[in-house]
């Protein structure tokens, strides 16, 4: 991201940052982690080139939301388990919304930079230098190729792809890059166990929670209550979108999916929405929640990384949130858009 290309004299800061966040977020599955890791590198680089610090922080916070939509994504995995939907189909359904969100945000950031006259001091880039940079990163770039190629090619399941990618990353870190010693390897194993244990406990409690609600017929009662008020698909989806946006601002995405999926799924299926389509809706909603004031987690992380006031960053993020909401509405009311790769609605 330090080597930012220029287009018509305007430094296209959004392009490398959004693409980097898409890859990093897809691998990590965490919006806040993406903001922390990428923001620490890109925010200082942008401010050195004359960009406003608050705009740079808001841009990275928004870019961190995009990675959650790009497969392989933890929220899609958790939803697939909760709703008994094919995780592979969910991954494919997340590609179009993620790319659409990234493109509209790139366009906005480019226009904003051009309006402000932020041309920066980009270095001259040639095909040779870009090729050399790609060659230097070839081992790291193979990770998403293994994961996505293995899953979409039908060679392996998401679980098998994750295991192979983890083993590949260990080999590369230990023997090729030689940046991971025994101590760092052990620390990475401990951190991985901590992260995995959280998800395992969460899913165990989710199963118990879902069984209790099923026995008590809570989802059916809520579905009958909402559908008793209105049977309009447009109104029901609008109300659910508002609910998910509110929940996404203060609740961790995986927990929200586990709790809300068994409650809302009977409602949306009652108005003709498929579980696959609803998976896209809920994940895109919760991704937007990461950057929605006043308690969007990505905003807090970006504020800490940039050492900037939260309210100023939130103000800069509002136009980006509006564009993300536009993508959400398209994905909600035009299911053929996010599901075009899957091939069924």
Question: What feature does the model see in each segment?
Answer:
Residues 1-13:
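Single conserved hydrophobic/aromatic residue that forms the stacking wall/gate
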């Amino acid at each position: 991201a330090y080597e930012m290309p220029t287009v018509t004299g305007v430094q296209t800061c959004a392009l490398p940052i959004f693409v980097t966040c898409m890859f990093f977020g897809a691998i990590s599955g965490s919006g806040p982690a993406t903001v922390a890791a990428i923001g620490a590198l890109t925010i200082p680089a942008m401010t050195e080139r004359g960009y406003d610090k608050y705009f740079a922080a808001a841009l990275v916070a928004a870019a961190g939301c995009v990675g959650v939509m790009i497969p392989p994504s933890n929220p899609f995995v958790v939803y697939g388990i909760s709703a008994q939907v094919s995780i592979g189909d969910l991954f494919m359904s997340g590609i179009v919304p993620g790319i659409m969100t990234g493109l509209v945000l790139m366009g906005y950031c480019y226009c904003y930079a051009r309006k402000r006259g932020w041309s920066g001091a980009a270095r001259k880039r040639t095909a040779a230098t870009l090729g050399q940079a790609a060659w230097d990163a070839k081992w790291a770039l193979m990770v998403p190729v293994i994961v996505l190629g293995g899953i979409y090619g039908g060679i392996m399941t998401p679980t098998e792809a994750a295991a192979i990618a983890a083993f590949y990353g260990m080999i590369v870190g230990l023997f090729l890059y030689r940046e991971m010693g025994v101590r760092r390897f052990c620390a990475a194993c401990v951190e991985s166990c901590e992260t995995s244990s959280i998800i395992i406990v969460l899913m165990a409690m989710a199963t118990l929670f879902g069984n209790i609600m099923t026995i008590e017929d809570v989802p059916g009662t809520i579905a009958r209550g909402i559908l008793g008020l209105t049977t309009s698909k447009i109104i029901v989806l609008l109300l659910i979108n508002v609910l998910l946006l509110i929940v996404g601002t203060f609740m961790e995405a995986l927990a929200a999916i586990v709790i809300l999926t068994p409650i809302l799924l009977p409602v949306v299926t009652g108005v003709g929405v498929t579980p696959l389509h609803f998976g896209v809706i809920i994940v895109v909603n919760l991704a937007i929640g990461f950057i929605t004031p006043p308690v969007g987690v990505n905003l807090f992380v970006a504020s800490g990384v940039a050492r900037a006031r939260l309210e100023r960053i939130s103000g800069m993020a509002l136009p980006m949130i509006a564009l993300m909401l536009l993508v959400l509405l398209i994905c909600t009311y035009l299911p053929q858009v996010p599901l075009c790769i899957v091939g069924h609605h």
